[in-house]
Amino acid sequence: MPTQTPNRPSATKTSKIPTRAEKRPDEFIVVASDQGLGLNAPQEMGNKLWAPMFVMGVMAFAAALILGFVRSNAIATAAGAGTIAQLGHVTTGVMFIGFTAVLSAITFAIARILGVFRSEGGNVQTLASGHVQTLTMPAAAKGMILSMVMGMMAIIVAVGLHVYVAASVVGASEASLATAAQWGSSLEGVRRLGVGMHLFGIVLGLATIVHVLRFQSIRILEVAKERAASP
């Protein structure tokens, strides 16, 4: 008798890999799949880095506070003008390391929130209809990342120059002190530019959250109508 070969279960097809992006009638640009796509790279990074960056910022602020006390004590005890100038530059540099770390932590936290919307929204659509639409990364989200990077680079450059100027102060010569004061005034603009870029990126991140919430509210209604129309 011929032996019967047991039927092998056929491999289930999946389209978790997104199809080409397409624009919906309501102007949202999405990719379609039958499963949630999970987090993208910036959202994964946000999950991992928001807490370490926040801790780094708090530590930098604490160090700047201690350096501020040291500098005020140097002024009170009539320490050398060169030492006071050096401490001024170092304290400012450490403080702005704290600023860039905390503002970056906020940006990473926004990316983490967007990741929750993306992953959980995909899971809900998978369970409800099996037809998932995932937003492509909006221009505002890309701008948020770019603004954070530019702000961080501006502040890091300013901090590096503060340290360089502090190391260049020699004794209490008038030339060294004048150069240190001039650099302090010039770097203030660079620091403010960096903080401004950070804040602009955070605004873009909040605008992205609003954009995602608008899409998800519309998509929830669509899924509910699909469920109601199905037999």
Which residues are covered by each model-predicted region?
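Membrane-helix interface motif
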Residues: 63-80, 157-176
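Cytosolic juxtamembrane helix at the C-terminal end of the final transmembrane segment
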Residues: 107-128, 202-231
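Hydrophobic alpha-helical transmembrane segments of integral membrane proteins
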Residues: 4, 129-161, 222-231
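Short membrane-interface loop/juxtamembrane segments of multi-pass integral membrane proteins
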Residues: 35-39, 123-140, 176-186
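Short, charged cytosolic
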Residues: 2-35, 120-128
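Alpha-helical transmembrane segments and their helix-start/interface "positive-inside/aromatic belt" motifs
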Residues: 40-58, 136-153
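Alpha-helical transmembrane segments and their immediate juxtamembrane interface regions
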Residues: 165-211
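Membrane-interface segments at the starts/ends of alpha-helical transmembrane spans
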Residues: 43-46, 80-96, 177-194
